[in-house]
Swiss-Prot record:
GO terms for cellular component: extracellular region. This is Conotoxin Cal22f. Expressed by the venom duct. Transmembrane segments: none annotated. Keywords: Disulfide bond, Ion channel impairing toxin, Neurotoxin, Secreted, Signal, Toxin.
């Protein structure tokens, strides 16, 4: 028979698992955490929408057979410029 502490721990873990599985584990908690870590801006993965259309279109990775997907992001160190670089397609 489980103790009260064991049941409470089990329920907490179950709720945590359900909360993270609802949206693939990348919900608002992660984005809020990364915003806090990077001075209020979202992390690199979430920065692409903030880059201008011209910057996104100027990025060309067709010359690279492996890293042929373009990722545009803001530098978390605080640079105001949007930087684009080539990555593996699954990292995009």
């Amino acid at each position: 028979m489980m103790s009260t502490k064991g049941i409470t721990l089990f329920l907490c873990l179950l709720l945590l698992a359900l909360a993270t599985s609802v949206n693939g584990g990348q919900g608002t908690r992660r984005s809020r955490m990364t915003r806090a870590l990077h001075g209020g801006r979202p992390s690199a993965r979430y920065d692409a929408p903030y880059c201008s259309e011209e910057e996104l279109q100027a990025c060309d990775c067709s010359h690279n057979p492996v890293r042929d997907a373009c990722l545009c992001q803001y530098d978390p160190a605080g640079s105001p410029a949007c930087e684009c670089f080539c990555v593996e397609p699954w990292r995009r």
